[in-house]
């Protein structure tokens, strides 16, 4: 990428305006016959030398960043795109070929638009049918997009018979009114780099981990920015979340590869609430047994898994499962199998926004493994301004998380479901909670023939003693991810281990949470109980269930 000044463009542009008559065409957008008044109108400045495509918001200096201005140079039909990423940051790219490659079916149909006789041309773009109405009366070429630049002056474009952009006025102008916008230095880049920079400028990225190792080794050490626990199986970093406004969506995105471990492993991305006297961070620093213990009567104590008056468990953002050996074991060859090189995991976590907004919190990743090479992971959290507003809750309270994140530091497996009591949590609401939901994530484990990993089991959820939800968490799509699992073992029946259906998880995938409606909950004490008919042990083999729950709602 190199830098050039915009001065030459401005000089040439102003020269063009002075030497050739310029027309300003204003367009309106409509969808299914309804004018889209919430969108700025497209403006095209056309003369014999070049076209410039902007909109009313840009011309009036009211556009939000990022925004684009497109110029079509004539007679070469070179498309020059300018992206204004933020104040003082402009990039551009040039395309000399796209206009010339356009093909159209020219039809005999005609109609009048603004008094001009228009002809119809039809083309297809990415399976979309585009109808273009253009006039040759003005002896000009241009339009509201790069489509049809060679046909004439495009006055109407219709896509798939429902989306329409139509010219509302055509007038001669002396002053284009955009000179003050095009100021400063411009960085030129290739088309792919341009698209990437423009795309990434549309959202905020919190880069948390970049190719960090998660392994099992006594040599794993913390540094100034990243803490490591449980022999390197947990990595942790403090993250400052910006204030998240209504209408902003938040995603977590993790990329993982094997760095030596060939097996499918349980993984989780989590955040540590610090709203009470004790937190999960205390357990990491001082040992799991310093955290509150849960006792269901089976003789074991499960530390740090349930909320108490003085303790909040780790809040799970995303449950994921590593594939069998992706990346490090791609040398294993099978005919017709072209292995993927990285496992991507991405999940919308907007419902957790109330517990993140404006706070500085520890964010961690755990992968349960006993391999010195282990895994490499990169983690980003992205924030997007969006018209989609599915989650309207302003409360997110972690109630339980039985996934033993500190497994390699002595935290026991979640085998509490071998008793009828299962998991039982008492919590207190200080205010009424409307439209309450339980964000419930569950996966069954026990990797032998009769283990709960491979045996469907009913999960039942009770609120204040009443069953509100019951289902069998079961994934039957695991075979879809075979190409992420090069080290998966193959059986005599023609199946591979990664093909097998499991209790709500597959190697190489995310496990989605269930959103269980609870209605309105009054202020005061409540209980939540999870019951699962956990299978019995066989020798040294046992089953366990990793369940996490976050209470959502509006206060």
Describe each PLM feature range.
Residues 181-555:
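Extracellular/secretory-pathway and virion-surface proteins
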Residues 1-25:
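Bacterial Sec-dependent N-terminal signal peptides
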Residues 11, 16-18, 35, 112-114, ...:
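Sterically constrained small-residue positions within well-ordered secondary structures
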Residues 15, 111-113, 119-123, 427, ...:
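Conserved catalytic-core segments centered on acid/base and nucleophilic motifs
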């Amino acid at each position: 990428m190199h830098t050039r000044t915009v001065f030459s463009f401005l000089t040439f542009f102003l020269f063009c305006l002075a030497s050739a008559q310029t027309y300003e065409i204003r367009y309106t957008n409509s969808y299914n016959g309804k004018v889209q008044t919430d969108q700025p109108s497209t403006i095209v400045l056309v003369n014999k030398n070049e076209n410039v495509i902007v909109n009313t918001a840009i011309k009036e200096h009211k556009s939000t960043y990022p925004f684009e201005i497109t110029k079509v140079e004539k007679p070469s039909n070179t498309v020059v795109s300018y992206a204004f990423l933020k104040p003082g940051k402009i990039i551009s790219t040039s395309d000399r070929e796209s206009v010339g490659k356009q093909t159209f079916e020219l039809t005999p149909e005609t109609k009048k638009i603004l008094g001009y006789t228009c002809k119809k041309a039809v083309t297809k773009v990415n399976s979309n049918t585009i109808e273009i109405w253009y006039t040759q009366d003005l002896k000009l070429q241009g339009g509201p997009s790069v489509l049809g630049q060679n046909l004439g002056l495009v006055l109407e474009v219709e896509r798939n018979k429902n989306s329409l952009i139509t010219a509302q006025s055509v007038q001669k102008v002396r002053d284009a009114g955009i000179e003050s916008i095009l100021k400063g230095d411009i960085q030129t880049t290739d088309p792919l780099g341009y698209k990437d920079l423009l795309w990434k400028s549309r959202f905020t990225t919190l880069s948390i981990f970049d190719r960090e190792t998660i392994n099992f080794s006594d040599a794993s050490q913390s540094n100034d920015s990243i803490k490591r626990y449980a022999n390197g199986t947990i990595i942790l970093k403090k993250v400052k979340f910006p204030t998240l406004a209504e209408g902003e969506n938040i995603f977590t995105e993790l990329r993982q590869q094997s760095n030596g471990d060939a097996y499918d492993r349980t993984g989780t991305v989590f955040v540590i609430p610090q709203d009470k006297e004790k937190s999960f961070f205390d357990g990491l620093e001082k040992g799991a047994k310093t955290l509150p213990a849960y006792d269901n009567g089976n003789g074991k104590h499960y530390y740090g898994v349930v909320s108490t008056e003085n303790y909040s468990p780790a809040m799970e953002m995303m449950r994921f499962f590593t594939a069998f050996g992706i990346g490090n074991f791609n040398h294993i060859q099978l005919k017709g199998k072209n292995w993927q090189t990285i496992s991507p995991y991405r999940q919308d976590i907007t419902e957790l926004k109330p517990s993140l907004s404006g706070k500085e919190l520890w964010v961690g990743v755990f992968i349960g493994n006993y391999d010195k090479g282990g895994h490499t992971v990169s983690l980003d959290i992205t924030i997007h301004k969006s018209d989609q507003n599915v989650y309207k809750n302003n409360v997110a309270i972690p109630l339980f998380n039985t996934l033993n994140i500190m497994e390699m530091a002595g935290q026991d497996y979640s085998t509490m479901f071998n008793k009828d009591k299962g998991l039982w949590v008492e919590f207190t609401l200080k205010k009424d909670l409307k439209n309450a939901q339980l964000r419930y994530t569950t996966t069954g484990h026990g990797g032998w023939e009769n283990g709960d990993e491979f045996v469907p089991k009913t999960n039942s959820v009770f609120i204040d003693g009443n069953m509100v939800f019951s289902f069998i968490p079961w994934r039957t799509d695991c075979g879809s991810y075979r190409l992420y699992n090069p080290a998966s073992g193959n059986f005599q029946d023609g199946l591979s281990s990664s093909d097998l259906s499991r209790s709500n998880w597959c190697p190489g995938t995310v496990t989605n949470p269930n959103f269980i409606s609870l209605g309105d909950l009054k202020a005061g004490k409540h209980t939540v109980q999870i019951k699962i008919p956990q299978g019995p042990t066989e020798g040294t083999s046992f089953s366990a269930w990793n369940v996490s729950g976050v209470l959502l709602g509006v206060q």
